[in-house]
Amino acid sequence: VPITLIIIFGLFWTQSKGTGAVGFMFGPVMLVWFLILSMLGVYNIIQEPSVLLALNPIYAFNFFSSQFSVAFLTLGAVVLCVTGVESLYADMGHFGRNPIKVTWFSFVFPALTINYFGQGALILSDPSAIKNPFYLMAPEWMTLPLVIMATVATVIASQACITGAFSVSRQALQLGFIPRMRIDHTSENQEGQIYLPRVNWMLMIGVMSVVVIFQSSSALANAYGIAITLDMIIATILAGFVMHEIWKWKWRYTLAFLAVFLTIDIVFFLSNIIKVPSGGWFPLLVGIIFVFLISTWKKGRKILFKKTKKETMEIDYFFKEMKKIIKARVDGTAVFLTPNPDGVPHSLLHNLKHNKVLHKRVILLSVKFRDYPHANGENIISIKKLPNNFYKVILNYGYKDLTKIPQDLARNLKGTFSLDPMDTSYFVGKESLVIRSGKEMNFFRKTIFSYQFRTSENITNQFNLPVNRVVELGSKVVF
């Protein structure tokens, strides 16, 4: 356990430096790893070729018909075979579907299958090998090199999962499912190479906690079985939504797909239910906590938006009152960020209240994150000219887009007017929440949301605004 904790700490500690320097080694190392798996499997299959009879489904049928309860519970162990493949698709956001499909069907799937057959062959010839079939497949002199190679392969697989967690967290952040957090780009050449400090350290604490709680991989298997089968059920349901809503499949075809695959997934899940007391409780607890935190953030944001919208002044009324309030207009462009494109931002009203001046050109900017990966062409920006040299601008981003508001504004406003970066100021609101008991959300959840809101990343950093051109104007909101 201490060695494992040291390796885990080292892995997470190096994340901030990026993987570009050593990333070129990952492919060759994994290639060698899967070749070793294949060779070990082939060697043992040659020793006991009768294991190939397992390809005949009649054996599985006879097993279920003669010993149904034992066979059913065996499914809970069989599902653990996917532990060898989750790293392959964990980082799909970087590689795409086709490279992973080609790699899986042409190389990884055959290698893993051959190795599993090899382990079966070893157990058939020597039943005592069931205590550790993988390492006993190899000659004794090869045990240490195999342990080292397995450790390196595990670290690389873990790296794929960590990078995948960064990608998914960034997309969830852009879609508004989790609070804003700092995103560092670790590569000048690849946009996808990112590092999220908060996610990184939370993952490290979580992984270390798992190691301390479960102590061994065999004990962890109980937790893994519940986690992976629940993930399979969720993935199947989401696939059903994609088929009907995106691919426009008819309901009867979608339901036929769900009936087949959900039946398989649910059977595997039920076979793991007995593992809940002995470790399966852990992923369920983690899942419940994350659902609670995400739903609290989403609901809190919705309530906060409604409250601020209710108190927002309408643009038409503002223009009527504008002449009474404004004594002077100064040179330059002011960009006021607002979540509500149809009202006057609180930051603008606070600016007028304290400074009693307004820039000659004013942009009311709303940034919207859409449910598609990239915004391009006509759907990236919407511009509406308003009286008094005001502009209402909606800037759209996909959930995989990098947000660089100054550059994106300047590029997309070229046809309307020229935006001088040294003559443009950005005004952002900084709300401070005052918690009150209410019907919309209980006090405890409001306290959690207040903490999430208070510790979320500054909008200046999230939108890559020039720090020396940003003015923050604070206000209190009764929540």
State each model region's role.
Residues V1-F479:
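The structured alpha-helical core of multi-pass membrane proteins
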